[in-house]
Amino acid sequence: KHFKILSSSAAYWRGDEKNQTLQRLYGTSFQNSKDLKKYLLMLEEQKKRDHRKIGKELDLFFFDDEVGPGLPLWTPSGTVLIDELEALAKEKETAGGYLRVRTPHLTKGDLFSKSGHLDHYMSSMFSPMDVDGIDYYMKPMNCPYHHKIFANTPKSYRDLPYRISEYGTCYRYEKSGELFGLMRVRSMQMNDGHIYC
């Protein structure tokens, strides 16, 4: 009975850019005006805590058109914050028995073909680049690399569980309409860990 239109946006029919654009309305409704007002007040409070607003106010990160959408640039203040969070996480991971690893940003397509990424995840990957006649891809996730590291040397049951972790930069092709601050980006630092038993 009590409703409010909250926002509107454009969307492609069935999510396909080749189809016509439709107008999407977002709204909410409640049984009484008191609950509606309470909900709208909560939304206003959330806006004050929006990471995009805080990031700008505290000069932590920004996006630049020449760099490209979904590719955040971290300022010195933001980098200090990231470094502190990473140090805390690394401390916890070390205490949990994780070993740190590093993996490359580019990989031959063969690895992603074997891992199933090309069959099941290619629409979220950037197009390949040709290097000496071989397709290379920017990594969308760290898993296949970690599996390679685990398989690189023979393991005894005494070596298990084998724990590795990494702050790997991953790249995902997010469509422009899917990008949202730091929540949906095209380049991200992913804290990733794997346990082999």
Where are the predicted features?
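Hydrophobic, small-residue-rich alpha-helical packing segments that form membrane-like cores
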Residues: 196-197
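Auxiliary tRNA-acceptor-end handling modules of aminoacyl-tRNA synthetases
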Residues: 1-164, 168-169, 174-179, 183
